[in-house]
């Protein structure tokens, strides 16, 4: 400040002197009887100079055409940027090749293996009743639907499937999507727009992350499955902030987290939702057909009225042994998607035989509730057998069909951790014919939860299958870790 004041004062004094000089009697002139001050003369000259510059033609240097030799040299020197960045060695994926259906037992690279790498929770892959329904549907409708739902792609079996799912879950209506992961990342942007607030779990999988990004909403993450962190986040966003009262607000969670096998505490989430007036989007790809007394998902598991969940989505490729996905809820929620959800509007509809398979799978679940008891028995047995694996610990919930093993002591680097886990997976497959997989994540995946080995338990696994994978993991982990 001490330096600025003298400079400012000196500048003001200089301007005053210049102004006084131009307004002095000697600087005044009389033209045609009109008194003209000196500063008007200066301003007139400036205007004349500006007009002169604007009226001049722009200067263009003479162009000399390049010779053919110069053109060739420039072409030879040009180095185009690569279409995509080079793949790092650690990012290369050499996945085993399956040569049969991905049931409890499958063939990998010509060898029969026990399969714990595919989500086939109810063991319905290869089910005769489902296969017969698919064959009948192909004979009646053909293989594909040949168009989006709004353009001659709606077939009666699609409507039957939507009605079946809504009736099974006790919701007003449902809507089918042609691809599992496109369901959630189409539904989120259909409802969440720029300026809205989304509070999401930091452990959500890539498809949910993609939906959050496409929505262009303001996204705030809370600690993985931590209700204290969720409550704190909601409080910070709403306390004393009148702006948040006027915009849409959502909580986005998974029922069973693909990246950890943890189960979301829905009762507490609903309590916080009602307290802070948020809406809930629940992703149930790994809980539909699994959790609850009759497999109706997380709401049945916690005894929460399903009407309290605003939007529910799920893929049908995990429990129902088919493909595609669905969103269910109120009639208003479903109707909005028929014109606003990109995955529904712009994609060819679900092949009719896959919709028939979904209907048959739900029928099978209703007629054979014992399949859930078999699944839970297998999960419990696997947890018991893997409780003392050297260097590994179970991070998943006891009721989750995803049994997630992570390192007890991390190396400090996710890349190094993954390399160790991949070595274990490869040795288990090569030496004991047990197919398991480590959790690979792309550079676009924002999830920062620990990597691990993910085992998908099926009701179709036998006790000997469970014991085999347990013994193999114990032996290999002891030799590697």
From Swiss-Prot:
This is Long chain base biosynthesis protein 1b. GO terms for cellular component: endoplasmic reticulum; endoplasmic reticulum membrane. It is found in: Endoplasmic reticulum membrane. Heterodimer with LCB2. Component of the serine palmitoyltransferase (SPT) complex, composed of LCB1 and LCB2. It catalyses: L-serine + hexadecanoyl-CoA + H(+) = 3-oxosphinganine + CO2 + CoA. Its cofactor is pyridoxal 5'-phosphate. The chain crosses the membrane at residues 32-52. It comes from Oryza sativa subsp. japonica (Rice). Serine palmitoyltransferase (SPT). The heterodimer formed with LCB2 constitutes the catalytic core. Belongs to the class-II pyridoxal-phosphate-dependent aminotransferase family. It is a single-pass membrane protein. One of its GO terms (molecular function) is serine C-palmitoyltransferase activity. Keywords: Acyltransferase, Endoplasmic reticulum, Lipid metabolism, Membrane, Pyridoxal phosphate, Sphingolipid metabolism, Transferase, Transmembrane, Transmembrane helix. InterPro entries: Aminotransferase_I/II_large, AON_synthase_class-II, PyrdxlP-dep_Trfase, PyrdxlP-dep_Trfase_major, PyrdxlP-dep_Trfase_small. The lineage of its organism: Eukaryota, Viridiplantae, Streptophyta, Embryophyta, Tracheophyta. GO terms for biological process: ceramide biosynthetic process; sphingosine biosynthetic process. Its main location: endoplasmic reticulum. Its EC number is 2.3.1.50. It comes from the Eukaryota. Pathway: Lipid metabolism; sphingolipid metabolism. Pfam families: Aminotran_1_2.
């Amino acid at each position: 400040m001490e330096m600025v004041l003298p400079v400012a004062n000196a500048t003001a004094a200089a301007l005053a002197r210049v102004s006084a000089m131009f307004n002095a009697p000697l600087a005044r002139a009389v033209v045609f009887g009109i008194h003209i001050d000196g500063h008007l003369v200066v301003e007139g000259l400036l205007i004349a100079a500006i007009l002169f510059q604007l009226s001049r033609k722009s200067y263009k240097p003479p162009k000399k055409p390049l010779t053919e030799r110069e053109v060739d040299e420039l072409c030879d020197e040009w180095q185009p940027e690569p279409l995509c960045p080079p793949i790092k060695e650690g990012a290369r994926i050499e996945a085993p090749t399956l040569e049969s259906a991905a049931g409890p037992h499958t063939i990998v690279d010509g060898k029969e293996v026990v399969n714990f790498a595919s989500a086939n929770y109810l063991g319905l892959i290869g089910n005769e009743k489902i296969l017969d329904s698919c064959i009948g549907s192909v004979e009646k409708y053909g293989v594909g639907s040949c168009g989006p739902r709004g353009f001659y792609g709606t077939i009666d079996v699609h409507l039957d499937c939507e009605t079946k799912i809504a009736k099974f879950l006790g919701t007003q209506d449902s809507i089918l999507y042609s691809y599992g992961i496109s369901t959630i990342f189409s539904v989120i942007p259909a409802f969440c727009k720029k300026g809205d607030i989304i509070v999401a779990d930091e452990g959500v999988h890539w498809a949910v992350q993609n939906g959050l990004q496409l929505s262009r909403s303001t996204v705030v993450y809370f600690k993985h499955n931590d209700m204290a962190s969720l409550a704190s986040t909601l409080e910070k966003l709403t306390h004393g902030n009148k702006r948040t009262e006027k915009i849409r607000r959502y909580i986005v969670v998974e029922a069973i987290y693909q990246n950890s096998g943890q189960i979301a505490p829905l009762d507490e989430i609903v309590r916080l939702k009602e307290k802070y007036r948020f809406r809930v989007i629940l992703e149930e790809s790994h809980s539909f057909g699994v959790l609850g007394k009759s497999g109706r998902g997380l709401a049945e598991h916690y005894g929460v009225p399903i009407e309290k969940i605003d939007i529910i989505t799920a893929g049908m490729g995990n429990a129902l042994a088919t493909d595609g996905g669905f969103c269910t809820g109120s009639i208003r929620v479903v109707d909005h998607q028929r014109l606003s959800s990109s995955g529904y509007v712009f994609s060819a509809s679900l092949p009719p035989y896959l919709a028939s398979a979904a209907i048959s799978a739900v029928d099978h679940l209703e007629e054979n509730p014992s399949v859930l008891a078999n699944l839970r028995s297998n999960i419990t047995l696997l947890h018991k057998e893997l409780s003392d694996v050297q260097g590994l610990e179970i991070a998943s919930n006891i009721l989750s069909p995803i049994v997630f093993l992570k390192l007890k002591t991390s190396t400090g680097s996710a890349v190094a951790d993954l390399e160790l886990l991949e070595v274990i997976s490869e040795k288990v497959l090569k030496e004991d014919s047990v197919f398991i997989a480590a959790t690979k994540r792309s550079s676009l995946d924002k999830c920062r939860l620990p990597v691990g080995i993910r085992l998908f338990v099926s009701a179709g696994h036998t006790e000997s299958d469970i014991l085999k994978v347990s013994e193999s993991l114990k032996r290999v982990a002891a030799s590697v870790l």
